[in-house]
Amino acid sequence: METRITKLLGSKYPMIQGGMAWIAESTLASAVSNAGAVGLIAGGSAPIDYLREQIRTCKEKTQNPFGVNIMLMSPNADDLAQLVIDEKVPIVTTGAGNPGKYMEAWKNAGIKVIPVVPSVALAKRMEDRK
């Protein structure tokens, strides 16, 4: 199945698994990616070393696109934002905040960014940052 989303994200199906805290770890994300959708690892307020381990494990288990969900209200959001760049995560989804201050760095790193935002106005501002 080919759609604009599958072309953009490099997946077989236009589906993205939710970044559910305490459930969406490397095992689930890699299984979803191996099935043809986009699996997500929940960043939440995970310690940096733990999330780094989950990202690396996911890379070992799949060659397909996967991502990390970052909750921007997390006290370590800045560190998580840098970690996905350092680990070359292909896709980032965000929630619970405005991802504007990270967009340029993520885009420069080649990361596909999918912000979940509360308003059309903010969505348009994020679109302008592509």
Give the location of each predicted region.
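Active-site entrance/lid segments in N-terminal catalytic domains of soluble metabolic enzymes
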Residues: M1-K130
